Amino acid sequence: MRTAWVAKRQGQTNVSQMHYARKGVITEEMDYVAKRENLPVELIKDEVARGRMIIPANINHTNLEPMAIGIASKCKVNANIGASPNSSNIDEEVEKLLLSVKYGADTVMDLSTGGGDLDVIRTAIINASPVPIGTVPIYQALESVHGSIENLTPDDFLHIIEKHAQQGVDYMTIHAGLLIEYLPLVKSRITGIVSRGGGIIAKWMLHHHKQNPLYTHFDEIIEIFKKYDVSFSLGDSLRPGCTHDASDDAQLSELKTLGQLTRRAWEHDVQVMVEGPGHVPIDQIEFNVKKQMEECSEAPFYVLGPLVTDIAPGYDHITSAIGAAIAGWHGTAMLCYVTPKEHLGLPNAEDVRNGLIAYKIAAHAADIARHRPGARDRDDELSKARYNFDWNRQFELSLDPERAKEYHDETLPADIYKTAEFCSMCGPKFCPMQTKVDAEMLEELEVFLAKDKEMVSQR
C-alpha cells in the first residue's frame, strides 16, 4: 500500500513523520491515521509535530497499514511474539503474528532470541504484518557474540540496529537510559533488574567499568532512525519487577534520563515513545503516568501492565489488565499485553488470545473513561442487542465472538435458541430483560403517580 508513498521520499536525509509534520506537510500516513481514528488530519499533524503522537512506519515496511500511538488517539495494545533457543520456528512465529492481529493487536514486537536465523524470522514477520513491528536489537547483538556479553562493542550494537532498520522494523526498544551511576540504586530492591536488555547492558558496564554504549552513541542511533523513519521505544531497564520496588530512586532516575533522550531525539525530528513499568500498586499508577508526562514532555507512554499484585502466577493477564486499564485512563498511550504464562513460561496460542482479549478490554475501558469520541458506541449497540435478545448480533459485537458463541452454545447449542428470549443462566421464566416497559405503559404510570401525589397532598 505504501510503496508509492515512500517512493516520493527517496534521496531525503530525514524521512520521519515528525520531520514532515514539523514542516507542515501532511503525509499519506497522517491522512490514513486521521480516517482510522476519526480525528481531523490537522490534529494528527500537530500532535506528531509536537511529539505527543507517533506513527511508527519504517519506509521499508510498505505493506504496513499506518496507525497512531498517542494520547489523542485510541489506547493501543501491543503483543509480544518471538522464537527462543528452545522452541518455535518461522512458521510458528508468523502464525503467532496472524493470531495476534486477529485478536486485535495494534502492534507486535518480535522478541526472538534464537530458534533459527533471526534475520530470516524477522523478515518473514515484517513481510506478513499489516501492523507495526517492534524489536529489541540488543538480543541479536548478544546472539552475534554467542552470548559473551563482555565481547560486545558499540559497533556491534550499531550494526544490528541498522540491520533491523533496513529490514523494515518500525520501532526499536533502545536501553539508553540506564547509566552506570544508577546501578548501585538497585541494591535495596527485592528483584533487582528484570529487563532482559537492561540486564545485558548492566553486565557490560560492570565488566568494562564504562558508560552505557547505547547512551554514548545515542546520536549515531538517531542518524540511523532518521534515514528509515524508525521510532524510538526508549526502554525502561530499571522498571520495577515487583510492587515493592515500584517508584523507587532507580526507576525515577532512569526516567529523568529518558526524558532528556526524548528531547535529544526530537531535536533531529525523530519519533519517540517511552516504556514504563512493570509492577505498580494501584495507588501509584496515576503518579507514574503523570511523572512520565512531566519528565518526558508528554511523549507517548507505553507500559507493560502494570501488574498490581505479585501473588497470582497463572493469572497475570488479570493482575496486569487491572493496572493497564487504570494507566490507560490516566493517559498511557499503549499497553503491552501480559499473558497467563507471564513469569512461568513461553505462551502458546491460547495464552496469546487470553492476554490480548484482556488488554483489548483494558484499552477499551480506558477509552470510555477518557470520553474519546465514539468509544462507547459499540457498547451501546451490544447492549441494545442484549436487551432485544439478538444473540447473533451480540456475538458479532463481542471482542471475541468465537468465545462468546462457544459459551452460549455449551448449554443451548440448537439454532432455535439464537432467537430465544433467555439464556441458561435465568431460564425462560426468570430473565429480567423479558420485562419490556413500553412508552405507553410508562405514560399511564406517570399519570397514576401524579394523581396519587395530588391525593396525598390534599389529605
From Swiss-Prot:
What Gene Ontology cellular-component terms does the record carry? cytosol
Q: Which GO terms describe its molecular function?
A: 4 iron, 4 sulfur cluster binding; carbon-carbon lyase activity; zinc ion binding
UniProt keyword Thylakoid, yes or no: no
Q: What does the UniProt keyword field contain?
A: 4Fe-4S, Iron, Iron-sulfur, Lyase, Metal-binding, S-adenosyl-L-methionine, Thiamine biosynthesis, Zinc
Q: Which residues bind substrate?
A: 80, 109, 139, 175, 195-197, 236-239, 275, 302
What is its cofactor? [4Fe-4S] cluster
GO annotations under biological process? Answer: thiamine biosynthetic process; thiamine diphosphate biosynthetic process
Which residues are involved in binding [4Fe-4S] cluster? 423, 426, 431
Could you tell me what this protein is called?
A: Phosphomethylpyrimidine synthase
Q: Which organism is it from?
A: Synechocystis sp. (strain ATCC 27184 / PCC 6803 / Kazusa)
Where along this sequence does the record place binding of Zn(2+)? Answer: 279, 343
Which Pfam families would you find in this protein's record? ThiC_Rad_SAM
Q: What does this protein do?
A: Catalyzes the synthesis of the hydroxymethylpyrimidine phosphate (HMP-P) moiety of thiamine from aminoimidazole ribotide (AIR) in a radical S-adenosyl-L-methionine (SAM)-dependent reaction.
Q: Give the cofactor note text.
A: Binds 1 [4Fe-4S] cluster per subunit. The cluster is coordinated with 3 cysteines and an exchangeable S-adenosyl-L-methionine.
Q: Which family does it belong to?
A: Belongs to the ThiC family.
Reactions catalysed, as given in the entry: 5-amino-1-(5-phospho-beta-D-ribosyl)imidazole + S-adenosyl-L-methionine = 4-amino-2-methyl-5-(phosphooxymethyl)pyrimidine + CO + 5'-deoxyadenosine + formate + L-methionine + 3 H(+)
